[in-house]
Amino acid sequence: MLQSVSVMGVVIYLGLVGAGLVAAFAFSTLLRSIKLI
């Protein structure tokens, strides 16, 4: 029971980190495109 909860927490944590990286990459790309215009 406790092990499954910890695994679920790790999966959620990795998902949040991945989403944060994608959002940061998209944001930096958006800023670059604005500067180019």
Swiss-Prot record:
Record's subcellular location: Cellular thylakoid membrane
Keyword Cytoplasm annotated: no
Signal peptide location: none
Keywords: Electron transport, Membrane, Photosynthesis, Thylakoid, Transmembrane, Transmembrane helix, Transport
TM ranges: 7-27
Superkingdom as given in the UniProt entry: Bacteria
A Gene Ontology biological process term: photosynthesis
Membrane topology: Single-pass membrane protein
GO CC, any one term: plasma membrane-derived thylakoid membrane
Record's subunit section: The 4 large subunits of the cytochrome b6-f complex are cytochrome b6, subunit IV (17 kDa polypeptide, PetD), cytochrome f and the Rieske protein, while the 4 small subunits are PetG, PetL, PetM and PetN. The complex functions as a dimer.
Job description of the protein: Component of the cytochrome b6-f complex, which mediates electron transfer between photosystem II (PSII) and photosystem I (PSI), cyclic electron flow around PSI, and state transitions. PetL is important for photoautotrophic growth as well as for electron transfer efficiency and stability of the cytochrome b6-f complex.
Similarity comment: Belongs to the PetL family.
Protein name: Cytochrome b6-f complex subunit 6
Organism: Synechococcus sp. (strain CC9311)
Gene designation: petL
